[in-house]
Swiss-Prot record:
Official protein name in the record: E3 ubiquitin-protein ligase SPL1
Phenotype reported upon loss of the gene: No visible phenotype under normal growth conditions, but mutant plants show increased disease symptoms and cell death after inoculation with an avirulent strain of Pseudomonas syringae pv. tomato DC3000.
Gene: SPL1
This protein's record includes keyword Transmembrane helix: yes
This protein's UniProt keywords: Chloroplast, Membrane, Metal-binding, Plastid, Plastid outer membrane, Transferase, Transmembrane, Transmembrane helix, Ubl conjugation pathway, Zinc, Zinc-finger
Length: 338
């Protein structure tokens, strides 16, 4: 599971890195056009070599704008929706308002951008637009009055039509837009902007400078996210290896501690085999005050948790539990004798 999560993070980091590079290439490929009057000459020079991706700003205009049915707003894209609102009686015999969305209708006309110095046609369908349309009109049309018999039948059925709400959303004439796309010539020789087969394409209300800055910030965020995911993936993948190395180091240290303790016991046994001359004895004078581990040095430490005093300082540092009661050792106190 750790390996799978690690590989997933690494793949996510690689994907974000590729997205970062793609966004960076998109930013570098965009040619900013500050005045539309210069676009004709720019297309003449550069579009012959590679597809020319430009970024332009201007106000929306059209020779044949669409007029909203319920208002005087003119636009180039129109989306009209109708919502029938009714009252229904539920099982508690209370009336609840419900609505049913009818089939929406869309319209669009040829449009262009105009910045005061020139204009350029934009060949973008409403499906490719990706803009939040402005509400041109929002009208509620009440249902026609019904006869007394029809009203009584509707009451008995638990159904009453309130009316229809008509909402029209448009891209109004004069709306400032920023368009990033490919500049080409149409069959009439006029310059138009269209969606490129490969490359960036944006239609937004954001000004040109803010759009470029936003794309740069987005690229940097993707870069940092890719680095973070990659590092996390490497850590998750290498975690079993790190745990294995630490376990081997711990086993090696434990084995050396045991060998050291065994060597001390063997050395102590060899010394005890020699004649014992006077030396340290217990308080009763019967048994030497020797460490119970090495049986060589006198015990001079006490374990705070259990209170036993039975080991010398070197042996107490090698132990994890008390050799008498097997309680875990947390703190060792050294005892000084007079």
């Amino acid at each position: 599971m750790i390996h799978l999560a690690g590989f997933t993070c690494c793949l996510g980091g690689v994907a974000l890195y590729l997205l970062t590079r793609s966004t960076g290439r998109d930013i570098k490929s965009i040619t900013r056009v500050y005045q539309l009057k210069d676009l004709e000459q720019l297309v003449e020079v550069e579009s012959k070599v590679v597809p020319l991706i430009i970024a332009v700003s201007g106000d929306v205009g059209s020779e044949t704008p669409i007029k909203c049915e319920h208002s005087y707003v003119l636009g180039v894209f129109l989306k009209r929706t109708a919502e029938q609102q009714v009252l229904r009686r539920n099982w508690r015999f209370s009336w609840v308002r419900n609505s049913t969305l009818m089939q929406p209708m869309t319209k669009e006309v040829p449009w262009y951008l105009d910045d005061g110095t020139g204009r350029v046609n934009v060949d973008v369908s409403q499906g490719e637009l990706g803009l939040a349309l402005t509400v041109g009109s929002d009208v509620f049309e009440k249902a026609e009055p019904v006869s007394l018999v029809q009203g009584a039948l509707g009451y008995l059925k638990g159904f009453k039509i309130l009316g229809v709400r008509h909402v029209e959303r448009v891209v109004p004439i004069g709306t400032p837009l920023t368009v990033v796309g490919e500049a080409v010539r149409d069959g009439m020789g006029n310059v138009r902007i269209q969606k490129p087969e490969q490359g960036p394409f944006y239609v937004t209300y954001i000004p040109l400078d803010q759009l470029i800055s936003k794309l740069g910030d987005l690229s940097r965020r993707f870069k940092y996210a890719s680095m973070g995911l990659t590092v996390l993936g490497v850590i998750l993948i290498s975690k079993p290896v790190i745990e294995y190395i630490l376990k081997r180091i711990e086993d090696t240290l434990e084995r050396r501690r045991r060998q050291f303790a065994l060597k001390r016991v063997v050395d102590a046994a060899a010394r005890r085999a020699k004649p014992v001359t006077g030396g340290g004895t217990s308080r009763d004078g019967d048994t030497p005050d020797l460490c119970v581990v090495c049986l060589d040095q006198k015990y001079n430490t006490a374990f705070v948790e259990c209170g036993h005093m039975c080991c010398c300082t070197p042996c107490s540092l090698q132990l994890r539990t008390c050799p008498l009661c097997r309680e875990r050792i947390q703190q060792v106190l050294k005892i000084y004798r007079h």
